[in-house]
Design a protein with these regions (language model features):
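Structured mid-domain segments that build the active-site/substrate or prosthetic-cofactor binding neighborhood
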Residues: 1-66, 70-71, 175
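Flexible helix-coil linker/hinge segments at domain or subdomain boundaries
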Residues: 6-15, 90-101
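Conserved small/polar residues in nucleotide/adenosyl-binding loops
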Residues: 176-181
């Protein structure tokens, strides 16, 4: 899988790095260990000591691309498909963790810049695709698209199945359009 290969490339960059490159971190205990100057730092990141996260954006747009542009919020079937995609991502990172000893995790990415940039790149490559690139941005991770106007409680309920899958973290964002929401 391409995502695993990319993350393993990041890990490989630590191989051969000696503790002396950052003595406060690796030799004086800031990382919870005291290595010798010529010790390889990569080993301390195994066994869950640190995480390397797979982030994702655009679950809403992915569902639209695969199943049409009915809104995810309005369809239990589409919601189930979206959750299944994120569950599969979580299973993958858990498997990679078991296979390598590195702390792979799934990060429900809050990345407005990336949501904008990737949509622009995809629009340039594939044109305007209704329900996918037509807004000019992708939705953050599992978030409810901001164009869907619901109250904050319904938004939280809609997003509730996803945080337990986000072993690398997530953000819950509520937008209030009034200084005194009711």
């Amino acid at each position: 899988m391409l995502a695993r290969k990319a993350l393993m490339t990041r890990i490989a960059r630590l191989e051969g790095v000696k503790a002396r490159v950052a003595p406060i971190l690796y030799m004086e205990g800031a990382c919870g260990v005291r290595l010798k100057a010529d010790d390889d730092v990569s080993e301390i990141f195994k066994n869950g000591r640190a995480s390397i996260s797979l982030g994702y954006i655009g679950i809403h747009e992915t569902i639209n691309a695969l199943f049409g542009d009915k809104h995810l919020y309005d369809s239990e079937q589409l919601r189930a498909k979206a959750i299944a995609i994120v569950e599969r991502l979580r299973q993958a990172v858990d498997q990679w963790k078991d296979e390598t000893g590195y702390g792979f995790s799934l990060y429900s990415t809050p990345s407005e810049n990336l949501c904008d940039r990737f949509c622009r790149l995809d629009t340039a490559e594939f044109g305007v695709v209704p329900g996918v690139t037509d807004k000019g941005y992708y939705t953050n991770s599992f978030h409810l698209d901001v164009e869907k106007k619901v109250n904050p409680y319904d938004k939280i309920d809609f997003e509730a199945p996803y945080p337990p899958l986000a072993s690398g973290g997530f953000i819950c964002c509520l937008l209030y359009t009034s200084p005194s929401p009711r």
